[in-house]
Curated annotation (Swiss-Prot):
The modification Phosphoserine is found at residue 40. InterPro entries: Ca-bind_SignalingProt, EF-hand-dom_pair, EF_Hand_1_Ca_BS, EF_hand_dom. This is Calcyphosin. Keywords: Calcium, Cytoplasm, Metal-binding, Phosphoprotein, Repeat. The lineage of its organism: Eukaryota, Metazoa, Chordata, Craniata, Vertebrata. Ca(2+) 1 binds at residues 34, 36, 38, 40, 45. Monomer. Does not form oligomers in the presence of calcium. It comes from Canis lupus familiaris. The gene is CAPS. One of its GO terms (molecular function) is calcium ion binding. Pfam families: EF-hand_7. One of its GO terms (cellular component) is cytoplasm. SMART domains: EFh (SM00054).
Length: 189
């Protein structure tokens, strides 16, 4: 294990100590920091952003992380690749149940889930904001999709985005049985 791997392990542990939303919260926070929508951060932005969240990296660690995930030689890290590396690996059982849930949602079978795909399996009619007239059912479906739609809010969720979302959830669950039961119940598999 090299110094950057050790740094990633340190960050992963700090994130996981924050519970289910540790890595997901970090992802949302970094996307807000990325004001130019380049999907990248330099070492100073990374270090400052982590510090705001109470996660500590020294300058050398931040620079090492940026070098590892610098895909184009610009001196910045690729945000999505970095966040993916922070998430712990998943077992085959977890990957399989995520794929099964995605397949159920992808009614058209084209490899992406859209609002049209959701209409048959998710109803927003009973959502409190629909009931109050504040949102339409279409808005509820779109906002639901946005939970999974990671980089570009294009109204389409790929299997990779779905897996990324659930790898963050998976990190907070100790056993495969617990995770599989949650997914099976949530998606009526």
């Amino acid at each position: 294990m090299d110094a950057v791997d050790a740094t990633v392990e340190k960050l992963r542990a700090q994130c996981l100590s924050r519970g289910a939303l540790g890595i997901q919260g970090l992802a949302r926070f970094f996307r807000r920091l990325d004001r130019d929508r380049s999907r990248s951060l330099d070492s100073r932005e990374l270090q400052r952003g982590l510090a705001e969240l109470g996660l500590v990296l020294d300058t050398a660690e931040a620079e090492g992380v940026c070098r590892r995930w610098d895909r184009d030689g610009s001196g910045t890290l690729d945000l999505e690749e970095f966040l993916r590396a922070l998430r712990p690996p998943m077992s085959q059982a977890r990957e399989a149940v995520i794929a099964a849930a995605f397949a159920k949602l992808d009614r058209s079978g084209d490899g992406v889930v859209t609002v049209d795909d959701l209409r048959g399996v998710y109803s927003g009619r009973t959502h409190p904001k629909v009931q109050s007239g504040e949102w339409t059912e279409e808005e509820v479906l779109r906002r639901f999709l946005d939970n999974f739609d990671s980089s570009e809010k294009d109204g389409q969720v790929t299997l990779a985005e779905f897996q990324d979302y659930y790898s963050g959830v998976s990190a907070s669950m100790d056993t495969d049985e617990e995770f599989v039961a949650m997914m099976t119940s949530a998606w009526q598999l």
